[in-house]
């Protein structure tokens, strides 16, 4: 239905008059087919509308890089050390910069947050991955905001195999990262 040429012509005509559209999501449709035509998530729709209604565009033309969330450092193939950072502050900063007209890149460690609309997202896991992602984009940015909760320490040695539970205690030497 969404791909129908008549519908697309009508959408294009309305866009020429200044109307804006939120493109549909893709997936399994009510008719049983798959493709574009599903209603977008309501949080996504809310973000798009808020961004359109935001009057203050003082960051228009600026490139902003924001880091967010925690990083994880592996101990063995099944365990890691991290912190409880939710990433909310970094994501909120990225959304605000986007709403104010900036071209935003969000470099984020693992979080349960939804990826913000209209933001270039780079997902990372470790300190090293975050550093490399930031350095790759750094020179092209006007503003860099470091809101991530990067791990301060990492295990001195990574165990290639899962550490067995043979002992009552485990000593885990750490080094500054």
Outline where the language-model segments fall.
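Short, glycine-/small-residue-rich phosphate/pyrophosphate-handling segment
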Residues: 1-26, 36-49
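General beta-strand structural signal in soluble alpha/beta enzymes
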Residues: 21-24, 106-107, 146-147
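Short glycine-rich anion-binding loops that position phosphate/pyrophosphate groups of nucleotides
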Residues: 27, 69-73, 148-156
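A glycine- and small/hydrophobic-rich beta-loop-beta segment
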Residues: 110, 118-177
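A short acidic, helix-capping loop that chelates divalent metal ions and anchors anionic groups
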Residues: 1-2, 29-33, 75-76, 115
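Gly-rich Lys/Arg/Thr-decorated short loops/hinges at beta-loop-alpha junctions or inter-strand turns
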Residues: 25-30, 70-76, 161-166
């Amino acid at each position: 239905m969404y791909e129908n040429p008549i519908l697309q012509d009508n959408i294009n005509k309305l866009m020429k008059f200044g109307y804006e559209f939120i493109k549909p999501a893709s997936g399994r449709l009510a008719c049983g087919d798959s493709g574009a035509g599903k209603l977008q998530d309501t949080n996504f729709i809310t973000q798009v509308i808020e961004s359109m209604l935001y009057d203050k565009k003082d960051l228009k033309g600026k490139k902003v890089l924001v880091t967010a969330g925690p990083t994880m450092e592996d101990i063995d193939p099944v365990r890691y050390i991290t912190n409880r950072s939710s990433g909310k502050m970094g994501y909120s900063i990225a959304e605000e910069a986007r709403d104010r007209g900036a071209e935003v890149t969000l470099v984020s460690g693992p979080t349960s947050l939804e990826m913000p609309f209209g933001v270039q997202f780079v997902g990372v896991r470790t300190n090293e991955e975050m550093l490399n992602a930031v350095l790759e984009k750094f020179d092209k940015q006007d503003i860099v905001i470091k809101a991530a909760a990067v791990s301060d320490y990492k295990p001195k040695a990574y165990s290639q195999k899962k550490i067995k539970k043979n002992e009552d205690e485990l000593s885990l030497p750490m080094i500054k990262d």
